[in-house]
């Protein structure tokens, strides 16, 4: 364990896999793979060249986002008859917990072992406008070809919770170019289409749209279509309702080399974001700048804007309850 630029770095190593996690944002900074798909080692997640950037303007790279991942319309919601006003950071809306979300916080190391690290954060009552003191933990655990993420949260007052990790993946290597040549499959019959503000407009079948990824497609081929949903999001930035319940496969991604990432989760959906905002501003660990679609985020989570949509599964957490969520990344 080393400390650099006031951010603690924890490195977990197993056969063929190295994971670096920072206390800044509880962020995955590196996921280095050594396998038969390439010569030498390859870092398959995007990470900032300067670790100090995570706590300042990290762009969510590899970070845990919260208290509410994704968007809350108008930066407001009503819970138990009380209206709560959140900080807004995407026009009139709240994205990923607000202007000072969990991605910008200094998490503390609660426990470390040879194969895992557990990080903890306390979010006080009223933080970014959210009610209740929230105690959050995330545990990263590595095994042969796998990274497991376990989240827990408790509160002393009714609140809403939606946590995810915002890692951007490029299976051909961080800084190697766009993910256009990656092939993606998403286990979803239903998606949440978006409006120009990227808020969901409801739920719809994926059939007959460029949001149908039930059979694998090359990302660049689909994103080349002239479709309103792709124009709004500069590619994909959509919540897909994962088929089934319990732990199951949400998405499968394959790079040019044949390296494959399978994402498994117990959450209702996965937000698929193809990184349309990257514009060369962010410098990666390789020293290269990240252009459009430098990585793809597969964010397992509850429904966006669920606090304002009673027809969707609830994301409310009450005193005495424990929020739990598990996601597994499998590399092969």
Give names to the regions the model predicted.
Residues 1-332:
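An exposed, glycine/acidic-rich loop-and-rim segment of catalytic or binding clefts
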């Amino acid at each position: 364990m080393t400390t650099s630029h006031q951010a603690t770095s924890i490195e977990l190593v197993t056969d063929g896999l190295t994971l670096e996690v920072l206390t800044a944002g509880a962020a995955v900074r590196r996921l280095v793979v050594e396998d038969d798909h390439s010569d030498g080692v390859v870092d398959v997640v995007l990470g900032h060249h300067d670790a100090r950037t995570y706590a300042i303007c990290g762009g969510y790279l590899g970070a845990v986002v919260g208290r509410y991942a994704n968007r809350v319309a108008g930066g407001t919601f009503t819970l138990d008859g009380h209206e709560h006003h959140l900080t807004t950071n995407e026009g009139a809306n709240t994205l990923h917990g607000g202007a000072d979300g969990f991605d910008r916080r200094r998490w503390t190391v609660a426990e470390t072992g040879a194969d895992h690290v557990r990080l903890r954060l306390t979010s006080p009552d009223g933080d970014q406008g959210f009610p209740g003191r929230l105690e959050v933990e995330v545990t990263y655990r590595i095994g042969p070809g796998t990274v497991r993420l376990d989240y827990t949260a408790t509160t002393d007052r009714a609140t809403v919770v939606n946590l995810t990790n915002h890692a951007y993946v490029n299976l051909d290597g961080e800084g190697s170019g766009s993910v256009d040549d990656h092939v993606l499959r998403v286990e979803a019959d239903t998606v949440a289409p978006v409006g120009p503000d990227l808020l969901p407009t409801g739920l719809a079948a994926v059939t007959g749209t460029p949001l149908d990824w039930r059979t694998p497609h090359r990302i660049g081929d689909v994103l080349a279509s002239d479709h309103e949903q792709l124009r709004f999001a500069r590619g994909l930035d959509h919540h897909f309702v994962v088929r089934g319940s319990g732990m199951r496969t949400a998405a499968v991604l394959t790079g040019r080399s044949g390296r494959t990432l399978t994402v498994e989760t117990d959450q209702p959906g996965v937000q698929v974001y193809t990184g349309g905002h990257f514009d060369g501003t962010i410098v990666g660990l390789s020293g290269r700048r990240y252009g459009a679609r430098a990585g793809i985020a597969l964010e397992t989570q509850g429904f966006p804007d669920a606090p304002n949509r009673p027809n969707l599964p609830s994301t409310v957490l009450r005193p005495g309850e424990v929020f739990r969520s598990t996601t597994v990344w499998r590399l092969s």
